Amino acid sequence: MATPSFGNSSPQLTFTHVANFMNDAAADVSAVDAKQLAQIRQFLKANKTNLIESLNTIRQNVTSSGDHNKLRSTIANLLQINVDNDPFFAQSEDLSHAVEFFMSERSSRLHIVYSLLVNPDIDLETYSFIDNDRFNVVGKLISIISSVIQNYDIITASSLAHDYNNDQDMFTIVSLVQLKKFSDLKFILQILQILNLMILNTKVPVDIVNQWFLQYQNQFVEFCRNINSTDKSIDTSSLQLYKFQNFQDLSYLSETLISRISSLFTITTILILGLNTSIAQFDIQSPLYMDTETFDTVNSALENDVATNIVNEDPIFHPMIHYSWSFILYYRRALQSSESFDDSDITKFALFAESHDVLQKLNTLSEILSFDPVYTTVITVFLEFSLNFIPITASTSRVFAKIISKAPEQFIENFLTNDTFEKKLSIIKAKLPLLNESLIPLINLALIDTEFANFELKDICSFAVTKSSLNDLDYDLIADTITNSSSSSDIIVPDLIELKSDLLVAPPLENENSNCLLSIPKSTKGKILTIKQQQQQQQQQNGQQPPTTSNLIIFLYKFNGWSLVGRILQNLLHSYMEKGTQLDDLQHELMISIIKLVTNVVDPKTSIEKSSEILSYLSNSLDTSASTINGASIIQVIFEIFEISLQRKDYTSIVQCCEFMTMLTPNYLHLVSSYLNKSDLLDKYGKTGLSNMILGSVELSTGDYTFTIQLLKLTKVFIRESLSLKNIHISKRSKIDIINKLILHAIHIFESYYNWKYNNFLQKFEIAFHLTLIFYDVLHDVFTINPHQKDQLIISSSANKLLQLFLTPMDSIDLAPNTLTNILISPLNTTTKILGDKILGNLYSKVMNNSFKLCTLLIAIRGSNRDLKPSNLEKLLFINSSKLVDVYTLPSYVHFKVQIIELLSYLVEAPWNDDYPFLLSFLGEAKSMAFLKEVLSDLSSPVQDWNLLRSLYIFFTTLLESKQDGLSILFLTGQFASNKKINDESSIDKKSSILTVLQKNSLLLDSTPEEVSCKLLETITYVLNTWTNSKIFIKDPKFVNSLLAKLKDSKKLFQKKENLTRDETVSLIKKYKLISRIVEIFALCIYNSTDSNSEILNFLNQEDLFELVHHFFQIDGFNKTFHDELNLKFKEKWPSLELQSFQKIPLSRINENENFGYDIPLLDIVLKADRSWNEPSKSQTNFKEEITDASLNLQYVNYEISTAKAWGALITTFVKRSTVPLNDGFVDLVEHFLKLNIDFGSDKQMFTQIYLERIELSFYILYSFKLSGKLLKEEKIIELMNKIFTIFKSGEIDFIKNIGKSLKNNFYRPLLRSVLVLLELVSSGDRFIELISDQLLEFFELVFSKGVYLILSEILCQINKCSTRGLSTDHTTQIVNLEDNTQDLLLLLSLFKKITNVNPSKNFNVILASSLNEVGTLKVILNLYSSAHLIRINDEPILGQITLTFISELCSIEPIAAKLINSGLYSVLLESPLSVAIQQGDIKPEFSPRLHNIWSNGLLSIVLLLLSQFGIKVLPETCLFVSYFGKQIKSTIYNWGDNKLAVSSSLIKETNQLVLLQKMLNLLNYQELFIQPKNSDDQQEAVELVIGLDSEHDKKRLSAALSKFLTHPKYLNSRIIPTTLEEQQQLEDESSRLEFVKGISRDIKALQDSLFKDV
């Protein structure tokens, strides 16, 4: 977090920001950005003296006299803030925020010191500064603790609030006082943590020892005693003023903080006394023991504590201190014979500690401080040292086990290999299987480490038996001889016995009616020990009479301890079945300990081979005949105990058995699954499960939820293991049923847990942590993989149930969405505010992270599924968005900023159909502006959080894409849309506008990670695309030039593209992404800019552009062979799986990068037990590595394609925008694009877009050449056309297969258009045709002949299908793809025209005709015209016109026309239904425009064309045509005499055609065809064929009719009608109507003149 500095435009670096940075850097300093680390180190160097000095809270004259704000002054006095020296506090509008920031800064200083002590590498210089002044710092810290304690209770909220009448001010005071109190407690806790690190394993000076003990006695202990009262820490005097607080949570938090402070006081004291963890003893060479005065001071303090201690009152010092002092005194006396202390002086401290239950308090101390392993280590070392002084008994061993098992591995090993421990352990083992003396202590110690347990229990060499009398023992005394390993002589061991016969003994805890006895065979040696004296002494001290003599016989007998333990547990089961919770405490504890031991055995950390072996031992001695357990394994015994404990509500046993089952699940899922199917733990047959009963009747009443937490752990593990392939043999139905029940139980918990009563407040977080993690994992595994495979997952039904739970309709009231929302805004609660800096561990942070992840995933799933409507969860998030922004601005929770921004991004990205919610409305203007200011501060921070920056850029981009116009305008301009004209560039407030920061940050790309730079540039792209005032980027030469420089350097990307390492691939991916964004920006710059001389345009028009660009379009990163082989190998290895099933799908554009490739974590779960996956040998395929590489390869190719598409958009924009002809380099680009399509094709779906991109780019460039008039050499044109011809024949186009149904038309249409353009660019047709005739003819046959044939055949086929269904010609026939077919036909017709326009040779035309005839194209055209009446669009026979247009164009080539005539052209033109309709006559353009068009522009044009080509050869057919259409001809000519005639250009054209037809017929002497042979005397009669035009009289009559229009212009004006849309527009516009009428008049005059002219 960076806080704005008043009077300074740039934010200042804060301790809070540095502390958070160091927290992230602590994991791996080497991975931190070097520049940022240097800035942090510079800050620390400048402020190192202030880290400690500025923490002292005792200051004089803290408030300024000039501050007239009463509330601000009160708070400043409360916090000891000098307002004059703190401008942020003085000028902050939000006092609560300022106070939180002040406390955060104070806490962060300590956090920085702590981080440096833990990880000095962060800043060695500052660490050395602190280390060199270590003990001065320690002294100052102790003084600060004293100061805080001294001032803790001076001010109460009620006394301060009393002076205020304003409720809001009272509320602020009360809240801040409470926050300060807890902040002070945390402050002390932090200091103690630092103190312990600084004095650990050091020789503490005596002045520090004296200072500590003085303050400890006078202040620290009294403070802890007093503050332990809730009203002291919570200030109950003001409870009425803030009823909103959760008093229970605050009470627990208070107790937790105080108990930790008190415990840390103890640890600090132990360390000051010299406990050294490196040597596992107290260092008596410390100054404390060298200085007599100081030593006596400490001794006197402890003696005084012993002497003045009153019954029922806690001592000043923890019993551990007294215990330690007794050890120290004994140790000193042993080393220094002159020591003056006698036994009584030493033992009184030990006795005092033991009287205060020191061991149990040690256990409590360990539990309280378990959040940090350092303290567990200290206590473990203390226990190791104490082995010299205390025995290992049933009770002490229990404490040892609980504490030491939590210590770091090295210290566990040190303890277990300690010489003293080994000696005591050998004595314990010798007494086995005696219960109290040996068995219980050994089992407890075995809980420390499983390896240790197995080593000690697997082979036991002694068996102890107690007997009051030896009379029944048949033995002989012997002296045994053993060999001395250190010498050649033997050693005689006296007083041994040897059994003369077998001895039968009962195993421990065997039932009275059991007949099971253990036989110790004869000849077994042993030793008899008397225990009379020991017992006498003990019992005489208790005032009892001495007992009879008792004997302990230890036999040298080998047996397996595990078997004995298993037998004992079975015996305990029998007792438990009888007595239940009335079972003896000792036996109950033993039962729990054994179950814990078996739990450790089955823990996944233990190898399955080892655990199976031990489980076998444990089951060896079970009584199968008497057991009620099927199979009588130790696991079944524990299951039976679990079932009984559930029935009897024995909570301790329930928890331990559930933990056992959790640990058992990973390796023995089949056993757990079998048990859960039979058990009543979960709901069954409509009956509520015992888990719910325990929750309701036990946990909710006690406030302890350990079992529920353990059951959630079991749920998580069971789901994970059920997905594993190793458990595929277990019934899928069974696993699904169990998982569904576990999830339903988890749902039930989630809906209500938030409001439960808790004894341990952290359990609330733990429950939330497990629930959110379970829900997230289930939903993620199902909805982020291949959607066709998700239903196969056994968790699919549970995932759907979770969706129903969370994504409920908006009008519903459901608990789950409310609970999840409450978690997200929980940092605003007083309790969780106090947890701000993770002082109580990072569990809360984990809960929040899980909850944000779950929430964003749910919204992403909803947004990606069109069937899911906006949910109640989203509605709640919008309603609570203001609170989310409040959390965003909290100083203590800066680590949640990324998650909040990501959530808001998903929220605004999700689609809404109706009632779109506007974020600005929910935030309000004040909160929106505060949000903007915080965001601006984050964007301008001196040391950036790159993840936050990346998330902010994504949020801006998403905001601009969404409909959140109000917030978008605020962020872009710094002002609200209602305030000013947002389209006015002057309305932008540069100080508050995101644009300003984006512009500044865009110049820092070199120092920004590529991933963040890409998101920044993506945001700028959207700004350019959506915001009219975004020209600041275009006008900024620095911005443009910096991007251009990166673009020019992109050539280096391709210096190595083969055999890339993983790191090189990742690096190249990042660079591709960056180049892609730059290119996108340039495309928008060109589009939006009016500057024709811009740097970008000049750059793109450079001669060597080809060298820079051509590589980007070559997508060669995809390793097809590798992917194919990987899929095959995966299938061979795991036949039941498909690798494609694990391919992830992006649910949102936001997480597109994360969800690309294969789901490795899910594969880890599924294949976790397979060594071929986890630990392949060198000879095996490393599938995990190869799949990781495959995912990376897919990502790499994806960005190759994205970059190529970006370049395509830029070149397209440039080509359209360029005002000058393109240079020759673009021709090379076209050739390159076509070659790439030939070489690489698009065999994968992912390559289709780039394949099309190259085709379309080729067309745009060629079209630009055409528009600019640029000439291309014929050789280059031919070269390009040959490449296009090759592409047409490729499998990607598959023209013959697709053209009929117009499939993949986006592939072939740009190619056809490119050919059209190239044909237009041909300058010399004859030479061109000569050079390319063969290829062109082949192309023509493929594309035109076959293309037209296939399209028309498909149309005819559909017509025939419709006809068979009985549709009459009056019905509209629906033809699939007719519009696309029509477009393709017209495009092909254009191609034919272009080919004929280059004047091909006669021979070329003959071959064309032959091709059309042989393919059947001509025939199908004629057939379609015959059926054209059946296809009507808007009741118009559209296909009739198209087919006649084709015939007309084809007839322009004489050889083709001849083929058409031979194919029956005239008969088709005469007899087709459309022609017959026209033959009825009176077809006028105003009433039947389509039919008239077919007649005039189709039939008449074709007949005239044929007549002009073939003359007398087609005269009979032409005369027949005229006779057939005589009525139409007559009506057209005679209608000119009609006063109501509507004059149109179409009518004039038709009349012109008829006049021309009559003249041509006359010229060919058509009358001769009608001369009939008659007598010589008979006169021949003239035949009238073209009625109305054949005679001079008719012509004069028509001329007269035309003259009427010419001589009466107003009349003509009134009779003119339009026949096209263009004509209609001309007539409607007065300015153009007159000219149009004049044109018609001229046309009529020309028609009149033509009547009497020769052809």
Curated annotation (Swiss-Prot):
- Where does cross-link Glycyl lysine isopeptide (Lys-Gly) (interchain with G-Cter in ubiquitin) occur? 406
Keyword DNA-binding on entry: no
| Regions annotated as coiled coil | 35-62
**Localisation:** Nucleus, Nuclear pore complex; Nucleus membrane
* Single GO biological process annotation from the record: nucleocytoplasmic transport
Q: Keyword set for this entry? A: Coiled coil, Isopeptide bond, Membrane, mRNA transport, Nuclear pore complex, Nucleus, Phosphoprotein, Protein transport, Translocation, Transport, Ubl conjugation
* Superkingdom of the source species: Eukaryota
Query: Which is one Gene Ontology cellular component term of this protein?
Result: nuclear envelope
* Annotated GO MF terms: structural constituent of nuclear pore
How the protein sits in the membrane? Answer: Peripheral membrane protein
Query: Major location, coarse class?
Result: nucleus
Region ranges (Leucine-zipper): 250-271
Phosphoserine: modified positions: 340
Q: PANTHER family of this UniProt entry? A: NUCLEOPORIN NUP188, NUCLEOPORIN NUP188 HOMOLOG
Per the entry, what this protein does is: Functions as a component of the nuclear pore complex (NPC). NPC components, collectively referred to as nucleoporins (NUPs), can play the role of both NPC structural components and of docking or interaction partners for transiently associated nuclear transport factors. NUP188 probably plays an important role in NPC assembly and organization.
Family, according to the entry, reads as follows: Belongs to the Nup188 family.
Report further notes: Present with 11700 molecules/cell in log phase SD medium.
Q: Its quaternary structure?
A: Component of the nuclear pore complex (NPC). NPC constitutes the exclusive means of nucleocytoplasmic transport. NPCs allow the passive diffusion of ions and small molecules and the active, nuclear transport receptor-mediated bidirectional transport of macromolecules such as proteins, RNAs, ribonucleoparticles (RNPs), and ribosomal subunits across the nuclear envelope. Due to its 8-fold rotational symmetry, all subunits are present with 8 copies or multiples thereof. Interacts with POM152 and NIC96.
Q: What is this protein identified as?
A: Nucleoporin NUP188
Species the sequence originates in: Saccharomyces cerevisiae (strain ATCC 204508 / S288c) (Baker's yeast)
Q: What is the lineage of its organism?
A: Eukaryota, Fungi, Dikarya, Ascomycota, Saccharomycotina
